[in-house]
Swiss-Prot record:
This is Small ribosomal subunit protein bS16. Disulfide bonds: none annotated. Belongs to the bacterial ribosomal protein bS16 family. It comes from Frankia casuarinae (strain DSM 45818 / CECT 9043 / HFP020203 / CcI3). One of its GO terms (cellular component) is small ribosomal subunit. Residues 137-148 have a biased composition (Low complexity). InterPro entries: Ribosomal_bS16, Ribosomal_bS16_dom_sf. Keywords: Ribonucleoprotein, Ribosomal protein. Coiled coil: none annotated. One of its GO terms (biological process) is translation.
Length: 148
């Protein structure tokens, strides 16, 4: 039986996730698999690649052929070079750890507590009640009587 190491597509439209699987060469892309040996998430930055190196080595040693996309993934992880006794690839880009939500909340709470002590940056405008009333009253008293 000819076996291939290929990608099985999962996920939503325009948000693919793949499983790296070993399957018979004649099966469909998402058909029955013999074994799942890894995962690939291309949309995250950097792409997430998880491969069981021991199982990949086993399947390559018994003659399983990787497809072109899987071969590229195995070259990035270094499993292909290990199988072919080639020099190792450069290290992969590692994602930065995400900040803890609790720490973010506490920092925002401390900043808000400090903001309450200060006055507002734009104070309210004072009403000009005296000058507005004088402007309205002046034309009424200065106007001569219409009958004179």
């Amino acid at each position: 039986m000819a076996t291939k190491i290929k990608l099985q597509r999962l996920g939503k439209m325009r948000e693919p996730h793949y499983r790296i699987v070993v399957a018979d060469a004649r099966t469909k892309r998402d058909g029955r698999v013999i074994e799942s040996i890894g995962q690939y998430h291309p949309k995250s930055d950097p792409s997430i690649i998880k491969v069981d190196a021991e199982r990949v080595g086993h399947w390559l040693s018994v003659g399983a052929q990787p497809t072109e996309p899987v071969l590229a993934i195995l070259k990035v992880t270094g499993d292909w070079q290990k199988f072919k006794n080639l020099p190792a690839p450069p290290p992969m880009k590692v994602a930065e750890p995400k900040a803890d939500k609790r720490e973010i909340f506490q920092a925002a709470a401390r900043a808000a507590a400090g903001a309450e002590d200060r006055p507002a940056t734009t104070p309210k405008k004072a009403k000009k009640s005296g000058s507005a009333e004088e402007a309205e009253a002046a034309p009424a008293t200065d106007a001569p009587a219409a009958g004179q």
